[in-house]
Amino acid sequence: MMILLTLFVAGCQPKSEKTALSPQDSLMLAKVNDFAVVTLTTDLGKLTEKEKQMIPLLIEVADIIDNLYWLQTLGDKTAFLDSIKDTITRQFAEINYGPWERLNGNKPFVEGYGEKPAGANFYPADMTKEEFEKWNDPNKTSQYTLILRADDRSLKAVWYHEAYKDQITRAADLLNKAAGFAEDAGLKKYLELRAEAFLTDDYFASDMAWMDMKTNTIDFVIGPIENYEDELFGYKTSYEGVVLAKDQEWSKRLAKFASLLPELQKNLPVDPKYKKEKPGTDSDLNAYDVIYVTGQANKGSKTIAINLPNDEKVQLAKGSRRLQLKNAMKAKFDKILLPISEVLIDSGQRANIKFDAFFSNVMFHEVAHGLGIKNTITGKGNVREALKEKYSSFEEAKADILGLYMTTRLIEMGEIKDITVEDCFITYMAGLFRSVRFGAASAHGKANMMCYNYFEDKGAFERLPEGTYRVNMDKIRTAMNEWAAKVLMIEGDGDYQGAVTYLDANGKIRESLQADLDRLKTARIPVDIVYDQGPKVLGLN
């Protein structure tokens, strides 16, 4: 699916007639090459014949969902891409799912486009916040409705399954067909219920079935799931599709950690009133090869771990599933994090940067989404509703810092034996440099910047004269605990105004850091990865 444009551009010209790229083309080519190409494969020998037959059907569903995400974020994919005559710019637009550079503050790079609409394509372009808030409709804040203009120019809410009826019906049919190949009873039930959910926009039963599913090898994360794209209110969810194959050996290594979640919740570094909720005991941790990705999960920066479902009712009843995407994680570690450490981490601490520490930090980031608090202690409803469009940034900040906290705790408890606390902190610091390059446009980017700036202000690290950074082991633990408490309190109090004020002041990249991030660009270290994927790549012709 993805091509190496450096080879493409060079290969298209006769040797005697090679011409220099224009400055604009050179800029676009550099931006495309900021994404290292990673081929998505898995060991087909570990799959049954029926599982191999099922995967192309799941990929077909994921492709339908990909087109729906384009509609949600911008509009018709084909019409937009056809309007871009330059091949290199079109390739970059495909990576970004539109004309805005996701990892550079959503700056437009296609002529004719201005600032990215905060409400994406979920709301009318001319709708104001005030108009929406005054409008009385019980479905307006649903995760699964589009807000459109009626013939009389008033607002109306339209369910996703109605707005996208033809595509949704086709996707549901394919899910039922895929269920026919499922040998695992749990997977079969989940796929059938997910098909039904597509047609009703009621995902509760299928989320519960997904959590009950334990012995499957193939997994499929599919549907309107995350609300990152809606930066106007944070209500609307975007479609995505992720096809996965479980790594059974690594998953066995992780299974023991799920039983420790209640104990970890009790020991969070915050006042007891913010940790009274008990996480579900049915939570599980598994490692996977990601083998196909579309929609929201494929735009810009690629996810390396997943924590679902988001439904608080399901989480309290069943816990949540943390999916560690091991092949994607290893690719980012090798192609991005290690090269960054050679430029920015003190040479005396580079030996502490280890994949197992990176894996643990990321894994417990996902675990941390299920910890803390889901419902405010101030009577303001659940945290997601109370913090509105700031929720995603603070939820990611919570997961980041509690993930670090839990990894260090488990090392000290003797539950994690192959890495040290020093490995954990120093690898986390290197990981922060990797993450802040996402920019401050996304929820993850804002979360990373708040953490980085808090650590800097507390002296958790220092910048050495030669331009590298050294972690202060005495101060970073205190900074970690204090930042964790601050985030948990903002969430637990449902302190929307506090969230707005803090994020505005601390969610930006400071000049001193930007200068060092620019050095990574000079060193031509990739910003992220892009996938070469599909049935042929997998060997499923």
Go through the PLM ranges and name each one.
Residues 184, 392-409:
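An active-site-proximal "capping" alpha-helix that borders the catalytic cofactor pocket
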Residues 7-11:
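C-terminal motif of bacterial Sec signal peptides marking the signal peptidase cleavage site
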Residues 373-397:
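Post-HEXXH active-site segment of zinc metalloproteases
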Residues 48, 360-374, 399, 404:
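Active-site recognition of the HExxH zinc-binding catalytic motif
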